[in-house]
Amino acid sequence: MMNFRQRMGWIGVGLYLLASVAAVYYIFEISQTYNRLALAQVEKTSGAQAKWPGDASSSSPSSTSWIVTLKTRLLLLPFWVWATIFLLPYLQVFLFLYSCTRADPKTVGYCILPICLAVLCNRHQTFTKASNQISRLQLIDT
């Protein structure tokens, strides 16, 4: 029998996945802004000479703002950088919601990377302390 926390965890997982599918559908099917930005970026990079908006070779460097320059440079980042930026937090939230569906409440949150690293480091320190105490006891007993 599932308790209330587990039921809410499964509802949270379902809603999170539903919202994710809706967001991906909106970005890749509905949003005309994304399509225009993608086409403009392809047209810029397919040209013979790509100019940076902040370069000295551009015709009027003061006419472009730093926001346009930043937006242009961010669009030039490779796909794996964007995938890492968006997938790491997405997976962390998903794993936290999934860990809420576990029967043992002590294991909630162990899937989150910082908590997982803290638990592993704490176990390593505890093991080191225990082995040092055992070696001291052996020295005292002899």
From Swiss-Prot:
Residues passing through the membrane, by range: 8-28, 76-96
Membrane topology term: Multi-pass membrane protein
Main localization category: Golgi
Effect of gene knockout: Knockout leads to severe developmental defects in zebrafish embryos, including heart edema, insufficient cartilage, and skeletal dysplasia.
Keywords, in A-Z order: Golgi apparatus, Membrane, Transmembrane, Transmembrane helix
Superkingdom in the source lineage: Eukaryota
Cell compartments where the protein resides: Golgi apparatus membrane
Gene Ontology cellular component list: Golgi apparatus; Golgi membrane
Its job: Required for mannose-6-phosphate-dependent trafficking of lysosomal enzymes. LYSET bridges GlcNAc-1-phosphate transferase (GNPTAB), to the membrane-bound transcription factor site-1 protease (MBTPS1), thus allowing proteolytic activation of the GNPTAB. GNPTAB is involved in the regulation of M6P-dependent Golgi-to-lysosome trafficking of lysosomal enzymes. LYSET is thus an essential factor for maturation and delivery of lysosomal hydrolases.
Protein name: Lysosomal enzyme trafficking factor
Protein species of origin: Danio rerio
Lineage, top ranks: Eukaryota, Metazoa, Chordata, Craniata, Vertebrata
